[in-house]
């Protein structure tokens, strides 16, 4: 243990602790801007400057380790002025379009400037905006970039892709796509983790809300909404709603209040995905001599892009089942269009997703089979919240309402798609029933739950032994793929989600700088599953009706046409 003094307070902490963490133990706040624990501890912003007795230069609290007998002062005049000057210099390279910025009110630089009482910037503005393709799912405004290097570190250390790089020096330092490439030329997964970790508005998703507003005013369009499982665990955060107010039923009511007549739940098509994917897995497993194993889940487009670009020889292991988003779009424009006596082109399908890469997936021609785009627009959770705010809807005052039928009923198994391991667990519940003729205990496969990036389990179903792996975060995915390629591990079924923690921590979820709500959202989804009256995808009566009236059975010819795809052919 190390004993030191911080602002005249004695502090004892383990060896290797930083000044920043030591100060937290005695409730002394040291401001930060670029810092992300264990990810970005490079002291690029110098906002966390402190005095250390006996040392001439100010120290960065975020990466300076404590020493026995050290005396630290965090709020002297010298420290205060240095921090203020550092923030003023950062502001001089950051365009001040706060009123129209998507992060206004949720911007760490804005909050820091206010806290430091900065009312003017005494330095000449040097912010410059560089060209960027505004059709891409992820947009970058270089005039707002503060060179904190978070995007560089997150992409390199959490996602193992290294899409971003630092170039230049001094006042000319900037961040760009590695090698000066355009984003659509780089091996970017479009996961959006760089967006959700940016402290300002330099990175954001493409905003497609106006397309939805226009469709709602078009009398020739039947606007159909689908809401992903993970969205219900996060949508109220940006609106200031408590968890007991931010329910899935109030979410349905809020979307309906925008003028949407058909409000459905993607949990329905998550159940549909399970019926198709579990059937495909059983078929592959029982014909292992001619099938590619392990079978990889395919509902995460960030993961699909990663596998295609980094391990193309393994792309054939992907399940051919479309994601719940794309399955829903296909069913909405075929089965549901017939129920409404409408043409497929008259259905305008909007999906609300916790994900930025879903925008790419919806625009991929090979992922649609009924029209050019089975899903017309993808909104992130953040975009939905902005629409609700733009329409001045008092969400908290709305009564709860159910999702519409017949595409609005889902099982608890479908709900847990939104958390890492959920797809695997849901698939195993149904695979067990198909192989044995009876349901397992609903929580029989809970062993695969958790937040560890790479988890593995072995389960026995009758006389069958299944070797399984679950991964979230692309750094973990890379480790797993390397091990599979080197034949160091052997599995039958593998679930991969690009974002740490799964969709709950998706790149399109509400941003809380310095806080991670992923695990809390996941627990919320597990509780919804536990409380559900239907916990098996194959027992969803709406799914049973869909097969009886339209599809026939899983893996039927029509199911293959509408619900399956060859990801190896997807346009990247």
Task: Show where each model-derived region lies.
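Short structural boundary motif marking the start of a folded domain
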Residues: 1-4
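Residues that cap or flank secondary-structure elements
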Residues: 11, 133, 143, 186, ...
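Iron-sulfur-associated redox domains of electron-transfer enzymes in respiratory
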Residues: 15-75, 79, 205-572
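A short N-terminal beta-strand-loop micro-motif at the entrance of redox/enzyme domains
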Residues: 9-15
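Fe-S ferredoxin-like electron-transfer domains
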Residues: 46-190, 196, 203-218, 222
């Amino acid at each position: 243990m190390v004993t030191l003094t911080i602002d005249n307070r004695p502090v004892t902490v383990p060896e290797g602790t930083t000044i920043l963490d030591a100060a937290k133990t005695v409730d002394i706040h040291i401001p930060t801007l670029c810092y992300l624990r264990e990810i970005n501890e490079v002291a690029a912003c110098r906002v966390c400057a402190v005095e250390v007795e006996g040392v001439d230069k100010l120290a960065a609290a975020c990466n300076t380790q404590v020493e026995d007998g050290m005396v630290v002062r965090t709020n002297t005049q010298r420290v205060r002025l240095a921090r203020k000057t550092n923030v003023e210099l950062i502001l001089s390279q950051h365009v001040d379009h706060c009123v129209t910025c998507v992060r206004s009110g949720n911007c760490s630089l804005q909050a820091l400037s206010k806290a430091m009482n900065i009312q003017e910037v005494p330095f000449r503005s040097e912010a410059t905006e560089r060209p960027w393709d505004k059709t891409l799912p992820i947009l970058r405004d270089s005039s707002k970039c503060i060179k904190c290097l978070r995007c560089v570190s997150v992409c390199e250390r959490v996602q193992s892709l290294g899409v971003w790089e630092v170039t230049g020096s001094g006042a000319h330092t900037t961040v760009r796509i590695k090698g000066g490439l355009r984003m659509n030329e780089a091996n970017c997964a479009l996961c959006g983790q760089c967006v959700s970790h940016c402290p300002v508005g330099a990175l954001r998703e493409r905003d497609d809300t106006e397309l939805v507003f226009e469709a709602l005013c078009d009398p020739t369009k039947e606007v159909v909404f689908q809401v992903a499982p993970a969205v219900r665990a996060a949508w109220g955060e940006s609106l200031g709603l408590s968890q007991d107010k931010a329910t899935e039923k109030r979410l349905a009511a809020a979307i309906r209040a925008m003028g949407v007549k058909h409000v459905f739940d993607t949990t329905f098509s998550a159940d549909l995905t399970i019926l198709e994917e579990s059937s495909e897995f059983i078929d592959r497993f029982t014909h292992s001599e001619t099938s590619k194993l392990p079978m990889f889940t395919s509902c995460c487009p960030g993961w699909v892009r990663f596998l295609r670009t980094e391990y193309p020889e393994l792309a054939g292991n992907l399940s051919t089942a479309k994601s719940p988003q794309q399955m829903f779009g296909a069913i909405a424009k075929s089965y549901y269009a017939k129920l409404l006596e409408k043409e497929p082109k008259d259905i305008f399908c909007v999906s609300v997703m916790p994900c930025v890469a879903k925008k790419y997936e919806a625009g991929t021609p090979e992922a649609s089979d009924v029209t050019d785009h089975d899903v017309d627009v993808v909104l992130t959770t953040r975009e939905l919240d902005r629409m609700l705010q733009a329409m001045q809807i008092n969400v908290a005052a709305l009564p709860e309402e159910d999702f519409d039928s017949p595409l609005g009923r889902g099982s608890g198994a479908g709900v847990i798609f939104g958390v890492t391991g959920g797809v695997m667990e849901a698939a195993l519940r149904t695979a067990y029933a198909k192989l044995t003729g009876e349901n397992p205990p609903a929580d029989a496969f809970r062993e695969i739950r958790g937040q560890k990036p790479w988890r593995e389990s072995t389960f026995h179903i009758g006389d069958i032994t299944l070797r399984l792996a679950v991964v979230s975060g692309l750094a973990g995915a890379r480790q797993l793929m390397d091990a599979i390629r080197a034949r160091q591990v052997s599995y039958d079924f593998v679930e991969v989600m690009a974002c740490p923690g799964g969709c709950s921590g998706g790149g399109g979820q509400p941003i809380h700088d310095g806080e991670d709500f992923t695990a809390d959202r996941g627990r919320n989804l597990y509780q919804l599953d536990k409380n559900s009256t239907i916990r098996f995808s194959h027992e969803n009566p709406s799914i049973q009706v869909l097969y009886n009236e339209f599809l026939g059975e899983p893996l039927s010819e029509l199911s293959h046409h509408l619900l399956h795809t060859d990801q190896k052919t997807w346009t990247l």
